[in-house]
Amino acid sequence: MLRKDIIKGEKMKFIRKDVINLTLPILAEQLFVISMGMVNTMMAGHIGKEAVSAIGMVDSINNIVISFFSALAVGGMVVVAQFIGQSNIKKANAAMKQALYSSILISVFITLLMFIFKRSILSFLFGSAEAEVINSANIYLSITLLTYPLITMDLICNGILRGAGDTKTPMKITIFMNVMNVIFTFTFINILKFGIIGAALGIALARSIGAFIVLCVLLKGSSVLKLTKLKKFKFDFTLLKPIFSIGVPASIESLLFNGGKLITQVFIVGMGTISIASNSITSSIGSMLNIPGNALCIAATALVGQHMGKSETEEASDTLAYITKLSTVSLIFMALIFLPFSGLAPRLYTSDINIINLSRNVCILYALFIPIWSISFVLPAGLKGAGDAKYTMVTALIGMWLFRITLGYFLGINLNLGLIGVWSGMFIDWTVRGILYLIRFKKGTWKEKQVIERVASR
């Protein structure tokens, strides 16, 4: 018994080391990304509440597309991670190329569709918003949607690098891109007085730079990955099948899940500009609170994928359990720090007292419920790394459509609780999904999933 405890202790020591080494660069990256995003929102806030509302509305659309490609990138990340786990570098590089080319092709198609129907989409979703808000939203969407292929390239390449265990390179690229974003946005908004056009141009130029840099990194070659023979390419369905077996369910989950979030945004638009602006501000503050959780989600997918590639199912389970606990403790710590300043934070975005008061109340609720977030998001991120993407998809959709949307509408609209009611529906969704993911994790059936042909455990 003592010997088993010693072995278990040694194993956990290596797990902690792997998690910390992989997570710290992601954490630094997330901190910088969210901070720069908050600065951008603050700068837009000084254009006017109409600009904040327009950006919040358009970002709810952009986030659906970005989340779709982030989810598709998970397929490439998991497959590359599992090949790296097997030390099969040739297959890892081939999978990277397949994931990149196929995703860019899909992104170009989506960009063309969105550009053709952009005005109709805004009118359909947010027709009840003020005319000035809709006009600003049309300008912002027209510019930002042209960057979808660049975002896709950035997400796929950085995701694959993380899957290979390299989190420092994506961190450096993302930090540089976000610094440029703030510089461009400040120049266009505060110096050149371009208004909402400046906000859109700033983010578009920064994304272009980020995509170019990460592509150059892979063309030059990292420690294990290198993109070669760009003109020589044909689809390899033996590699695309495992990539899309993870990526497609994850993308469907993301599309329908974020589509549900968009529906809740439509509820909020009907509540008026104060609620729209408060929702955008609270989302921005919530993103800052949730930095540790988001970083550990990425680490969970990569590390579980690598262990499953080596057929180390127990190590995968121990790693995911440790990451989930670490995330929960980190989020509780963030919430405790934030609560005393919940009234001050919204003042960084606006001077409108009505928006400040509503934002403060929703932020307090967010901080109280955030400890539940880990079992709702970190656990399924690890399950996807093992290939259990279909279960996470179905569970997420149940939570979103039965609780966040239906209950959010009932609380927010029928019971007239407004924005607080809509967000309360989201917190109940977190709770239900978290319980379902926890049951799945404890049962252990996810360990039987096979994405690529496994090697014997070493």
Region roles according to the model:
Residues 1-26, 80-147, 191-248, 304-369, ...:
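Short alpha-helical transmembrane segments in multi-pass integral membrane proteins
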Residues 11-42, 46-47, 63-75, 107-111, ...:
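N-terminal transmembrane alpha-helices
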Residues 21-37, 143, 206-210, 214, ...:
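Transmembrane helical elements of multi-pass membrane transporters/channels
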Residues 26, 30, 41-42, 78, ...:
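Transmembrane alpha-helix boundary and packing residues in multipass membrane permease domains
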Residues 35-53, 122-131, 187-194, 255-288, ...:
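Helix-terminus/linker motif at the lipid-water interface of multi-pass membrane proteins
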Residues 49-60, 137, 141, 200, ...:
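Small-residue hotspots at the loop-to-helix junctions and early N-terminal turns
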Residues 52-112, 151-170, 278-342, 373-396:
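Small-residue-rich hydrophobic transmembrane alpha-helices
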Residues 73, 143-162, 170-181, 199-214, ...:
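Short runs within selected transmembrane alpha-helices of multi-pass transporters and secretion channels
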